[in-house]
């Protein structure tokens, strides 16, 4: 596996938290915190891809790299594919890691762990999950579950992703974490496919890959990182970052 490239897609179009990537956390925009966590993972170069010049400016102000993409992409994966073609037309990077732009407190080690399943050449896409520990999350549709077959104590081969409570019976349920590491050829194939029936029904983009016969494996990590989607989440992220700076 050659030098991975980390891409962080970001947009200002969030409805519950307007201008989310530029929200201030401990004196810096949230997107800058995510960029720093990605740099700290040590995986490889990090680029923010966005349709908003203000986001590029915020990242470049701290020495980072941002690239402007078209505003009309139907999905984040399409934005990644365009950014990849702009940044690396020669194809030097054969692994692309997609880190969501609303994870300012994510542990860099978790980002690094995302690529581990790609050491297995049978795996097309790698992702992350964590065991669900809160009973209410087992039935919450916004908590996406990975239904998977164990490959090792810390890795599942994903057979399905669902908003339902699954699998049935005794045993753990796994909360999917939407961070992906793609083989470049898998990303290119993925965006060339049209939306699939199960993807449209569950509203889960990753089902497109499974329906097309691609293999997705998930590394099991200890915790689900805090995603910032609401003003309450933003307050929590500010408190976490402030506590880290005091320690």
Swiss-Prot record:
Its EC number is 2.7.7.38. Its main location: cytoplasm. The keyword Transferase applies. GO terms for molecular function: 3-deoxy-manno-octulosonate cytidylyltransferase activity. Gene3D superfamilies: Spore Coat Polysaccharide Biosynthesis Protein SpsA, Chain A. CDD domains: CMP-KDO-Synthetase (cd02517). It is an enzyme of class 2 (transferase). It comes from the Bacteria. It catalyses: 3-deoxy-alpha-D-manno-oct-2-ulosonate + CTP = CMP-3-deoxy-beta-D-manno-octulosonate + diphosphate. Keywords: Cytoplasm, Lipopolysaccharide biosynthesis, Nucleotidyltransferase, Transferase. Pathway: Nucleotide-sugar biosynthesis; CMP-3-deoxy-D-manno-octulosonate biosynthesis; CMP-3-deoxy-D-manno-octulosonate from 3-deoxy-D-manno-octulosonate and CTP: step 1/1; Bacterial outer membrane biogenesis; lipopolysaccharide biosynthesis. Signal peptide: none annotated. GO terms for cellular component: cytosol. It is found in: Cytoplasm. Activates KDO (a required 8-carbon sugar) for incorporation into bacterial lipopolysaccharide in Gram-negative bacteria. Belongs to the KdsB family. This is 3-deoxy-manno-octulosonate cytidylyltransferase. The gene is kdsB.
């Amino acid at each position: 596996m050659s030098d991975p490239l980390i891409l962080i897609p970001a947009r200002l179009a969030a409805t519950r938290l307007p201008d989310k990537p530029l929200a201030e956390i401990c004196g810096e925009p949230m997107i800058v915190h995510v960029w720093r966590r990605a740099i700290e993972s040590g995986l490889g170069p990090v680029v923010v891809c966005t349709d908003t010049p203000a986001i590029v400016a915020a990242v470049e102000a701290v020495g980072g790299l941002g690239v402007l993409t078209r505003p009309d992409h139907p999905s984040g994966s399409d934005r990644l594919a365009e950014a990849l073609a702009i940044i690396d037309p020669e194809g030097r990077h054969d692994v692309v890691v997609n880190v969501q732009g609303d994870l300012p407190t994510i542990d860099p080690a978790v980002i690094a762990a995302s690529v581990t399943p790609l050491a297995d050449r049978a795996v097309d896409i790698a992702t992350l999950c964590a065991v669900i520990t809160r009973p209410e999350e087992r039935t919450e549709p916004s908590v996406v579950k990975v239904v998977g077959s164990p490959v090792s104590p810390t890795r599942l081969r994903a057979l399905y992703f669902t908003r339902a409570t699954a699998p049935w019976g005794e045993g753990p349920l796994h909360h999917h974490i939407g961070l992906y590491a793609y083989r470049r050829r898998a990303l290119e194939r993925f965006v060339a496919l049209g939306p699939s029936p199960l993807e449209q029904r569950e509203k889960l983009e990753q089902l497109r890959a499974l329906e097309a016969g691609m293999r997705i494996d998930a590394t099991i990590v200890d915790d689900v990182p805090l995603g910032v989607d609401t003003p309450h989440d933003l307050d929590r992220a500010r408190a976490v970052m402030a506590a880290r700076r005091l320690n």
